[in-house]
Every structure is written in structure tokens, then in C-alpha cells.
């Protein structure tokens, strides 16, 4: 499972930047797609259409959907179902209020599963409803071999993508200036307020 996830993560990273290499990469990855970040042209691939679990690379689509449906200064109240979610976290508390911007930085910089769920409940009222929005966006992008079940990437039946689709999603997301800014941020301090502690991401 870890090797499959790493392969898809590699595909995402390779999609983020223009690639001028002339030799196929030397890797043990089960699947990959090396694309030119400017043109979208596939340079090299291996098992690029194989459906695999996508783990935290799920959050690329979560971030994209949130950016297209919310303003960054919109206030989110953390749903109890999002607080304390297993796995990587930005340590949200039920009832805490943060901006969409804060949650997106926690989502992408801390890989916060709780941030993903908090955004899902805020935007769509639930995990299943938000996953439907993610699947709708995937179809719009042309990622036809991708299916989302949740916004965070925790293991779930029917939650999968391909290296090829992941590259398409990443390339599309990077056209969004806010997304590009978030994923290029190295560190961030979120100051404390009345009901939220200070956080360092």
C-alpha cells in the first residue's frame, strides 16, 4: 500500500514542475506519469492507467473544490465529526472557528485530515455530499478513472485514481493562483484568536 501511494505521490510531484529530462526515470514505482508542467505533454509513463489508492494526494482535489466554492476569509465552524479524525492532523477542536484560508493551509501543509473533513461539512454538509462534488470536478477535468469517497484519503473501498489522472488534476489545480501559493508556502504561523490556539504549520 505504501509503495502504491508513493508512486502516485511521485506522479503528483512530477506534474507540478516543467520537466526537460530526456531519459526515462529510474524508479521502482509501480506506476508513474512524467508530464511537462507547462504543456501537459506526457514525457514518460509506466502503468499510468492502473487504478491505485491515492491517500493524501486526495487533498489536491479537496483544496481545489474548496477554493472554487468558498472565499478565503469565509468562517468555518469545525463540525464535531471532523475534530479528532485519525491520521495526520492540524488538531482542530469541535466548535472552533477558522477561516477557509487557515484550513486550506492546514490541509496542504500539515496534510490535515481534520481540516479536510471540516471543509467538507462546511461546504456540502457531509463527507458523501462533498465527495460527489469532487467526483463532479474530476469529470470536468477529464480524470475519468478517478473516484473519490472522502476528502482526506483515508483508506476506503472505491477511492482510487491513476498516475495519469493525478497528473491532470495537479496540472489543473496549479492554474489556480491561490492553490499554487498555498502549496509553495514553506511555513506559516496561524495566530491565536478567541477560540483557536496559535498554530505553526
Predicted regions and their residues:
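Penicillin-recognizing serine hydrolase domain
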Residues: 26-29, 126-201
Amino acid at each position: 500500500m505504501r509503495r502504491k501511494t508513493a508512486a502516485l505521490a511521485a506522479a503528483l510531484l512530477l506534474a507540478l514542475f516543467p520537466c526537460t529530462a530526456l531519459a526515462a526515470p529510474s524508479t521502482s514505482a509501480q506506476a508513474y506519469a512524467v508530464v511537462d508542467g507547462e504543456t501537459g505533454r506526457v514525457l514518460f509513463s509506466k502503468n499510468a492507467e492502473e487504478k491505485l489508492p491515492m491517500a493524501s494526494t486526495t487533498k489536491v482535489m479537496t483544496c481545489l473544490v474548496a477554493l472554487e466554492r468558498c472565499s478565503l476569509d469565509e468562517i468555518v465552524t469545525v463540525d464535531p465529526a471532523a475534530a479528532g479524525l485519525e491520521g495526520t492532523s492540524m488538531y482542530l477542536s469541535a466548535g472552533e472557528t477558522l477561516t477557509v484560508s487557515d484550513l486550506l493551509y492546514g490541509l496542504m501543509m500539515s496534510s490535515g485530515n481534520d481540516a479536510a473533513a471540516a471543509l467538507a461539512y462546511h461546504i456540502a454538509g457531509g463527507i458523501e455530499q462533498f465527495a460527489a462534488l469532487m467526483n463532479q470536478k474530476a469529470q470536468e477535468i477529464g480524470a475519468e478513472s478517478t473516484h473519490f469517497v472522502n476528502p482526506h484519503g483515508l483508506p476506503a473501498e472505491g477511492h482510487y485514481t491513476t498516475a495519469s489522472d493525478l497528473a491532470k488534476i495537479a496540472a489543473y489545480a496549479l492554474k489556480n493562483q491561490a492553490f499554487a501559493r498555498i502549496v509553495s508556502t514553506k511555513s506559516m504561523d496561524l495566530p491565536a484568536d478567541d477560540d483557536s490556539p496559535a498554530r505553526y504549520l
